[in-house]
């Protein structure tokens, strides 16, 4: 099981609710700038993968695509949702997990002010 908490008004939560599936992608340093820019606009208004050149590929167990070259990808199927103030906590079963140990994953530093690898 895994959980993610998303704002009630966001496009990602609406997609999860409509499909019942999502992928949690832990991306690597090659997508650092794209990951930062993704927070500057809504997926409701633009295709972020196209706009920020994020490579996608088919998932093995779910319909939504996954980010190619990620450190870790969790393919998830929604099992429950809980309202938490102005957010919704999505609880899911992990249906598949894949990854690449050679990819240096990004971490959020200073809140979300900076994304970087742990050794930077």
Predicted segment positions?
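Basic, polyanion-binding surface patches
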Residues: 1-120
